[in-house]
From Swiss-Prot:
The lineage of its organism: Eukaryota, Metamonada, Diplomonadida, Hexamitidae, Giardiinae. The active site is at 143 (proton acceptor). It comes from Giardia intestinalis (strain ATCC 50803 / WB clone C6) (Giardia lamblia). The modification Phosphothreonine is found at residue 205. Belongs to the protein kinase superfamily. Ser/Thr protein kinase family. Aurora subfamily. This is Aurora kinase. Changing residue 171 to A: No effect on autophosphorylation. One of its GO terms (molecular function) is ATP binding. Residues 20-300 form the Protein kinase domain. GO terms for biological process: microtubule cytoskeleton organization involved in mitosis; mitotic cytokinesis; mitotic nuclear division; mitotic spindle organization; regulation of cell cycle; regulation of cytokinesis. Activated by cell-cycle phase specific phosphorylation. Inhibited by ATP-competitive inhibitors N-[4-[[6-Methoxy-7-[3-(4-morpholinyl)propoxy]-4-quinazolinyl]amino]phenyl]benzamide (ZM447439) and cyclopropanecarboxylic acid-(3-(4-(3-trifluoromethylphenylamino)-pyrimidin-2-ylamino)-phenyl)-amide (CFPPA). Inhibition leads to reduced growth, increased cytokinesis, microtubular defects, and increased ploidy of the cells. Keywords: ATP-binding, Cell cycle, Cell division, Cytoplasm, Cytoskeleton, Kinase, Membrane, Mitosis, Nucleotide-binding, Nucleus, Phosphoprotein, Serine/threonine-protein kinase, Transferase. It is found in: Nucleus; Cytoplasm, Cytoskeleton, Microtubule organizing center, Centrosome; Cytoplasm, Cytoskeleton, Spindle; Cytoplasm, Cytoskeleton, Spindle pole. One of its GO terms (cellular component) is cytoplasm.
Length: 311
């Protein structure tokens, strides 16, 4: 990123919206809009997230936005979307972000319904690596879900590409699904993230999305980084079968399911994936599998990504 692109509080040339060519609309975020843009001097293509100060103030989330900027600007990992810089004018705050050319994981989940196990293995491994990095920096993410994971180009060997392209037995839809095992998946949103400077520290703030909330957060109890382990388990479950593990049309029952850890497996799950999820979705935070053991689990060590498309 060009050196002159610095936060408005830093040194050097002050970044303004005039430094960018604004392209197509990419989507709507929690507190603003996202556009494709190009920084004019470097020609670097970025995602420009626009937050409106009036809305931030009306929602009383000034502190949350400041925390998001502070945390996101100071993390750097292959599985985390890069926040290059941010700046502001009288009415807006602008975040200059790495582009994710293949969009949100949630959009792909809506498109395909569910994913083959090797694809899920790749997604969860990438996300778990990012969580391991964050936890080592005493950062709790607190809002892991498909909407907050973006898809970028990964490393696909020529052998894989040739094999996929030469296989006339699969449709374009199936071909794209198989390719998903070779993309790179990155955490994108740090709106609910928090830095806890004390190792092993605990918090009580309720946040996140109900379907992924661990019991201790939902019930307003103190919690620690193990909250992200539970959410990772709920995400893994949803990617495999297409439905969150504790979901019910009635919110009251969803809450009961979470509190009692009541869920069941469909035929989509392998023995390894069942064991993997069961080790994360445990009522007691202290009993949940560690992020290091997650990355060593057999389910995340699958190497055959040329799987059949789920029916």
């Amino acid at each position: 990123m060009p050196q002159h692109l610095v936060p408005h509080t830093g040194t050097g040339k002050r970044t303004t919206i005039e430094d960018f060519e604004i392209g197509r609309f990419l989507g709507r975020g929690k507190y603003g809009l996202v556009y494709l843009a190009r920084e004019q001097s470097s020609k670097l293509v970025v995602a420009l997230k626009v937050l409106y100060k009036s809305y931030i103030k009306s929602e009383r989330v000034e502190g949350q936005v400041r925390r998001e900027l502070d945390i996101h600007l100071n993390v750097r990992h292959i599985n985390i979307i890069r926040l290059y810089t941010w700046f502001q004018d009288e009415t807006r705050v602008f975040l200059v972000l790495e582009v994710a050319p293949y969009g949100e994981l949630y959009q792909r989940l809506q498109q395909f319904g569910k994913f083959p196990l090797p694809v899920v293995s790749k997604i969860i491994r990438d996300v778990a690596q990012a969580i391991q990095y964050l936890h080592r920096k005493n950062i709790f993410h607190r809002d892991l879900k498909a909407e907050n994971i973006l898809i970028c180009k990964g490393k696909e060997t020529k052998e894989h590409t040739d094999a996929h392209n030469s296989d006339d037995s699969i449709s374009v839809h199936e071909h794209e699904l198989v390719r998903m095992a070779h993309y790179t998946y990155k955490i994108a949103d740090f709106g609910w993230s928090v830095h806890h400077p004390t190792h092993g520290g605990r918090r009580r703030t309720q946040c996140g999305t109900l379907d992924y909330l661990p019991p201790e957060v939902m019930l307003g109890q103190s919690y620690d980084k193990a909250c992200d382990i539970w959410s990772l388990g709920a995400l893994c479950y949803e990617l495999i079968c297409g439905t969150a593990p504790f979901y019910h049309d009635e919110i009251k029952i969803t809450r009961q399911n979470i509190a009692n850890v009541e869920y069941s497996f469909t035929k989509d799950f392998s023995p390894a994936s069942k064991d993997f999820i069961q080790r994360m979705l445990i009522r007691s935070p202290e009993a949940r599998i560690s992020i290091e053991d997650i990355l060593r689990h057999p389910f995340l060590r699958q190497t055959d990504h040329r799987s059949k498309v789920p029916k």
